[in-house]
């Protein structure tokens, strides 16, 4: 029946249109998450230039709060993506062959997860540098302890976890695997009794080059 085929074709077109719209929303959401972290970093650079001590202190507190908000949003998103990637990795080769769209979705989640790791690290660094500017090192230690908990909860201290992300991503990022392996080792070995004011920069390093939020599906 031609009319039935026409209706079915229209429905399939509409489903594909909705799928494209959802992917566009996803890209916008990921860009918003990354922009939060970038905004906190920009605020830190600007706050350092404020001459008035009281205004600088108020601005620095705003920097810290912005960095914490960005960090938490990215951490939650990373954990959700990591859950789906782990579930996907347990499928058989045959199941994966039958689920092409799922494979593409997992690749997007892996790309997002790598981006999130870099920006989470940068957000923690922003938090710590903000507290250091205020001469408050105890909350800085707390930030590092929270980061350590995140790393351990997501098994990011295990290189295999990072390699799983890389394996499922269409954009191979072995350099991020190497960098974060090093960061995770230092953070998990961090001694909270250490002189934190001398070690923040050594503990936290991550590059943002080539980790832009734009999707490869645009």
Where are these regions (language model features)?
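Membrane-inserting effector segments that mediate pore formation, membrane fusion
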Residues: 1-28, 183-203, 207
């Amino acid at each position: 029946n031609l009319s039935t085929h026409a209706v079915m074709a229209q429905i399939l077109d509409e489903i594909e249109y909705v799928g494209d719209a959802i992917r566009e929303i996803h890209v916008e959401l990921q860009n918003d998450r990354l922009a939060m972290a970038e905004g906190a970093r920009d605020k830190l650079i600007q706050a350092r230039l404020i001459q008035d001590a009281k205004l600088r202190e108020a601005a620095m507190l705003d920097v810290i709060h912005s960095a914490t908000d960005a960090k938490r949003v990215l951490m939650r998103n990373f954990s959700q993506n990591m859950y789906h990637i782990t579930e996907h990795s347990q499928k058989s080769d045959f199941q994966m062959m039958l689920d092409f769209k799922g494979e593409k979705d997992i690749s997007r989640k892996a790309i997002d997860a790598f981006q999130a790791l870099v920006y989470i690290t940068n957000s923690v660094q922003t938090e710590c540098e903000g507290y250091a500017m205020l001469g408050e090192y105890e909350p800085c230690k707390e930030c590092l302890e929270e980061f350590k908990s995140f790393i351990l909860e997501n098994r990011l201290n295990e290189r295999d976890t990072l390699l799983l992300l890389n394996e499922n991503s269409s954009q191979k990022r072995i350099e991020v695997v190497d960098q974060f392996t090093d960061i995770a080792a230092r953070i998990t070995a961090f001694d909270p009794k250490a002189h934190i004011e001398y070690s923040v920069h050594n503990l936290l390093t991550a590059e943002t080059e080539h980790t832009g939020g734009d999707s490869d599906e645009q």
